[in-house]
């Protein structure tokens, strides 16, 4: 009657929890990552993606779409992979999703640098801020991937 079983469940943005559930229906939760940091990462990546979409629209209007399409794909994929990590099937899968998001962020940083260096986009406070946000997301993801891999 007092048998216990466990299962894994992704709860929020990039938060992994283990629940112990008894036969009588009571649960006990153990959180294994920093919920606040995860929420910040998810929010920043979503806001970043929206800014990337706006830049893409601007570039498309100017007929500068080849590099812009690559930037759009990688820039919006960051948040998508972070969102997908919420439903990871294991800690390994969770770490893998974050690693993919990190790779996409690095690719986006490359495309942004290429846009600036090729002078398709003029350096401006808004563009520099976008590049700064990309660097910040890379730093957050690097730390998150390291933590996730250590817990595997």
PLM feature segments, named:
Residues 1-80, 84, 88-152:
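Short, C-terminally biased terminal segments at protein or domain edges
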């Amino acid at each position: 009657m007092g048998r216990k079983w466990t299962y894994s469940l992704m709860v929020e943005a990039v938060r992994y929890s283990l629940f112990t559930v008894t036969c009588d229906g009571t649960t006990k939760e153990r959180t294994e990552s920093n919920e606040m940091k995860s929420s910040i990462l998810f929010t920043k990546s979503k806001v970043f993606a929206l800014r990337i979409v706006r830049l893409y629209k601007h570039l498309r209007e100017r007929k500068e779409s080849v590099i812009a399409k690559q930037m759009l794909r990688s820039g919006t994929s960051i948040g998508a992979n972070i969102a997908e990590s919420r439903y990871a099937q294991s800690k390994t899968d969770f770490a893998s999703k974050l690693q993919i998001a990190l790779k996409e962020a690095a690719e986006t940083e490359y495309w942004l640098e290429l846009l600036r260096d090729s002078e398709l986009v003029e350096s401006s406070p808004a563009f520099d801020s976008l590049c700064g946000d990309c660097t910040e997301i890379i730093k957050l993801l690097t730390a998150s991937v390291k933590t996730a891999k250590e817990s595997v």
